[in-house]
């Protein structure tokens, strides 16, 4: 095992991780004290460069990648912090669209393993510090920093950004962020800083007063993005990406770093190539069509299903779906197309909803179901049965499993249709 693999495995297996275990006192802390202590140990690397801070129920990851791509096209060295990762924890802290060297990660963990243990950091706290340190060591000109969950208490909420961005507000993580959209908006608006401009991508009557109140209290100018805002074409598939692009364009306009229009256009047209984004309406195969998407809550799932129904048309269609155990699945189950055959699977994380329970829920919803042990098995079986369009999702962890299966050659490339 390489030094990098040892370091990566230690971080993933040893440290409390929300994505794997769900919310516990060890994975979701109700203050930023540990994060601040950790950053002090590291020499406060987050203070070494300007940044843009992005929160939101959905769209924040794509918007971060768009911003990184735009600023890269403008000639800046850009650090990009996002989560969760799909295949490699270094996806959480890219520089110029590239992963940090494996040796850097191994050296960092060896140097700070005792600090991480002594502070009893969660995986997210540890990797946020890693990201900020990586960006300092790489001498970035700008960092794009995605919030992990919420905003007010998120470990990233130690930065003083050029702009604060809130892409959207939906019902997700309600046990931590509040029972309604107004409460969730208040938590996410916790990233608003004094005099720092704020860009919001969703602002209906339920949540706009929250943004107005907190922006006013911070003397921050509020910029509300609508479908009337200008938009340029992006290479990212997914109908929802147009609004993310509008948010990115508005953010560039208020952040204060000069960027030319042709650089914005080029950045939006090369997001995946410039930043390595995967898992957002990601076409894994064309014949048959296999598309993976990370939509995992009703706010993201409903538009994803509208697009799925449109692109599959009259094709014989299947869906490879798996979920985590701590989500409200009511809306998801109600909106799965009844004419699709469902290949139920279990994401390879401890938080996964166990397969027999998931299959039972699908059958109770009146769906045609096949039970499969893994995403790879499900995709292979759907292809073997001749389905012409296959959707992979329900959870970002199912998407990650599918990407890993394709990478490792576990999906048959033979076209059975």
Predicted regions span which residues?
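N-terminal leader/targeting and accessory segments in enzymes
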Residues: 1-58, 62-77, 87, 197-199
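ATP-dependent carboxylate-amine ligase catalytic core
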Residues: 22-32, 36-48, 73-159
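Extended acidic/charged loop-beta regions that coordinate divalent cations
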Residues: 84, 130-176, 205-235
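Nucleotide phosphate-binding/pyrophosphate-handling subdomain across enzymes
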Residues: 137, 142-145, 154-165, 169-171, ...
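A glycine-rich beta-strand to alpha-helix segment
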Residues: 377-407
């Amino acid at each position: 095992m390489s030094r990098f693999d040892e370091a990566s495995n230690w971080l993933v297996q040893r440290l409390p991780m929300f994505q794997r275990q769900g919310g516990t006192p060890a994975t979701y802390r109700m203050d930023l004290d540990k994060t601040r202590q950790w950053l002090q140990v590291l020499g406060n690397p987050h203070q070494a460069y300007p940044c843009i801070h992005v929160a939101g129920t959905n769209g924040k990851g794509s918007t971060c990648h768009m911003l990184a791509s735009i600023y890269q096209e403008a000639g800046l060295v850009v650090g990009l912090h996002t989560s969760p990762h799909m295949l490699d924890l270094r996806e959480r802290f890219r520089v110029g669209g590239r992963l940090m060297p494996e040796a850097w990660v191994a050296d960092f963990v060896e140097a700070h393993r005792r600090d991480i243990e002594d502070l009893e950091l969660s995986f997210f706290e540890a990797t946020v510090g890693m990201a900020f340190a990586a960006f300092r060591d790489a001498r970035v000109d700008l960092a794009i920093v995605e919030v992990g969950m919420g905003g007010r208490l998120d470990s990233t909420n130690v930065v003083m950004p050029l702009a604060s961005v809130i892409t959207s507000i939906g019902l997700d993580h309600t046990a931590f962020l509040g029972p309604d959209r107004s409460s969730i908006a208040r938590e996410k608006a916790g990233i608003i800083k004094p005099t720092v401009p704020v860009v919001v991508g969703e602002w209906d009557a339920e949540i706009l007063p929250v943004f107005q109140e907190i922006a006013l209290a911070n003397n921050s100018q509020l910029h509300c993005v609508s479908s009337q805002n200008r938009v340029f074409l992006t290479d990212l598939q997914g109908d929802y990406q147009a609004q993310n692009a509008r948010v990115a364009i508005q953010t560039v306009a208020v952040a204060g770093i000069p960027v030319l229009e042709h650089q914005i256009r080029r950045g939006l047209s090369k997001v995946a190539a410039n930043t390595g984004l995967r898992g957002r309406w990601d076409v894994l195969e064309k014949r048959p069509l296999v598309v993976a998407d990370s939509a995992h809550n009703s706010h993201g799932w409903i538009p994803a299903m509208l697009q799925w129904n449109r692109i599959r048309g009259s094709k014989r269609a299947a869906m490879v779906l798996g979920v985590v155990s701590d989500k409200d699945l009511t809306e998801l189950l109600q909106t799965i197309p009844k004419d699709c055959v469902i290949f139920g699977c279990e994401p390879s994380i401890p938080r996964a909803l166990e397969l027999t329970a998931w299959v039972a829920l699908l059958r109770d919803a009146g769906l045609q179901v096949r039970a499969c042990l893994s995403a790879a098995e499900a995709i292979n079986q759907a292809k073997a049965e001749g389905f012409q369009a296959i959707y992979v999702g329900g959870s970002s962890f199912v998407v990650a499993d599918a990407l890993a299966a394709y990478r490792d050659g576990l999906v048959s490339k033979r076209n059975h249709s």
